[in-house]
């Protein structure tokens, strides 16, 4: 059994960092050591920022985004086309689409996907809030931007079924060949989706 070489406070820091997605025990040790070496430039400011985030971060009651205000900055942005809602699984998907900068629309975060095997049903997700938003009127298009997994497809079909009869156009993200992708390296499912989603040039 290895002997402890640091105090309990540093061990606790390492253990907590190791819980961050993408950081294992080794990476957490490196990150902790780096933070400690840069105590004034990184560790102190990071500690303060995390304390502020803990105190101020809220979940938007309208769309499910995380922000320090409710409703969130996206929902109150008058420069956005609020008649288009992009439905995403998680806040990280919202951020990814925003980085792409392809659309200036509103969002709705589901908080996951339907997964009966994991016990996740419609009531466990933010689907009712989406239906209520569309029921308020003023929404002309719903873009379902969930992952191309079985759970994502199931969720997309469920949402589409729930919105039958409402006057809203429902679209999905195209699936297929990524920009710069080579056909030889793509899996069969991706190639099949690309062929089905082909467009006229």
From Swiss-Prot:
Keyword Hydrolase attributed: no
Mapped zinc finger ranges (C4-type): 60-75
Signal peptide, first to last residue: none
GO biological process: DNA recombination; DNA repair
Highest taxon of the lineage: Bacteria
Domain Toprim residues, every copy: 83-178
Keywords: DNA damage, DNA recombination, DNA repair, Metal-binding, Zinc, Zinc-finger
SMART domains associated with the record: TOPRIM
GO MF entry, a single one: DNA binding
CDD domains: TOPRIM_recR
UniProt family annotation: Belongs to the RecR family.
Known function: May play a role in DNA repair. It seems to be involved in an RecBC-independent recombinational process of DNA repair. It may act with RecF and RecO.
Record's protein name: Recombination protein RecR
Organism: Rhizobium leguminosarum bv. trifolii (strain WSM2304)
């Amino acid at each position: 059994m290895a002997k402890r070489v640091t105090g309990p406070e540093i061990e606790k820091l390492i253990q907590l960092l190791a819980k961050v997605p993408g950081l294992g025990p080794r990476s957490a040790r490196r990150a902790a050591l780096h933070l400690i070496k840069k105590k004034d430039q990184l560790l102190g400011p990071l500690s303060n920022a995390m304390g502020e985030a803990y105190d101020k971060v809220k979940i938007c009651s309208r769309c499910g985004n995380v922000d320090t205000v409710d409703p969130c900055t996206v929902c109150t942005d008058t420069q956005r086309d609020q008649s288009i809602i992009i439905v995403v699984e998680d806040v990280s998907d919202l951020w990814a689409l925003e980085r792409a900068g392809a659309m200036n629309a509103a969002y709705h975060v589901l908080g996951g996907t339907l997964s009966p095997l994991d016990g996740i049903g419609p009531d466990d997700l933010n689907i009712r809030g989406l239906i209520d938003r569309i029921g308020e009127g003023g929404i002309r298009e719903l873009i379902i931007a969930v992952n191309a997994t079985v759970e994502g497809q199931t969720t997309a079909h469920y949402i589409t079924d729930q919105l039958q009869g409402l006057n809203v156009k429902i679209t999905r993200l195209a699936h297929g060949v990524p920009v710069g992708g080579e056909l030889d390296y793509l899996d069969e499912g991706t190639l099949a989706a690309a062929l089905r989603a082909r467009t006229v040039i």
